[in-house]
């Protein structure tokens, strides 16, 4: 994922937020993978999202750390689902629905942003 797309996702979340804010975009998220029978530690840049009000079962100040690898997987899933999304990514014109889908896939269905023009 390129920097422009990464920061565009963070900007769209911050601009159209309803219950989650972007707390940090420069966070290093630790991830471990099994390679050749050995656990390797990798560090990815990640988004830190925080709820600023109670929403469903999530309490205020709940924080999610979503690494760039998972965001990239969500972006790939979006491009598979909607072939026109690839053009929007290249032009830097992602929509709110695109970002909601990316974050939902990147968080394994846990975080549903519910972005809107109006804050509730």
Report the location of each language-model feature.
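A short beta-strand micro-motif
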Residues: 6-11
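Short, solvent-exposed loop/hinge segments that bridge or flank secondary-structure elements
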Residues: 17-22
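Acidic, low-complexity, intrinsically disordered interaction modules
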Residues: 23-100, 105
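Short acidic DE-rich linear segments
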Residues: 117-120
């Amino acid at each position: 994922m390129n920097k422009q797309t990464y920061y565009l996702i963070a900007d769209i979340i911050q601009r159209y937020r309803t219950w989650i804010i972007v707390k940090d975009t420069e966070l290093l998220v630790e991830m471990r993978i099994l390679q050749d029978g050995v656990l390797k530690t990798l560090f990815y840049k990640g988004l830190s999202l925080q709820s600023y009000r109670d929403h469903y079962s999530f309490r205020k100040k709940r924080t999610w750390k979503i690494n760039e690898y998972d965001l990239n997987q969500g972006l790939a899933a979006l491009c598979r689902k909607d072939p026109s999304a690839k053009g929007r990514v290249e032009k830097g014109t992602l929509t709110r629905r695109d970002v909601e889908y990316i974050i939902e896939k990147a968080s394994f269905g846990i975080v549903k942003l519910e972005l809107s023009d109006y804050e509730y």
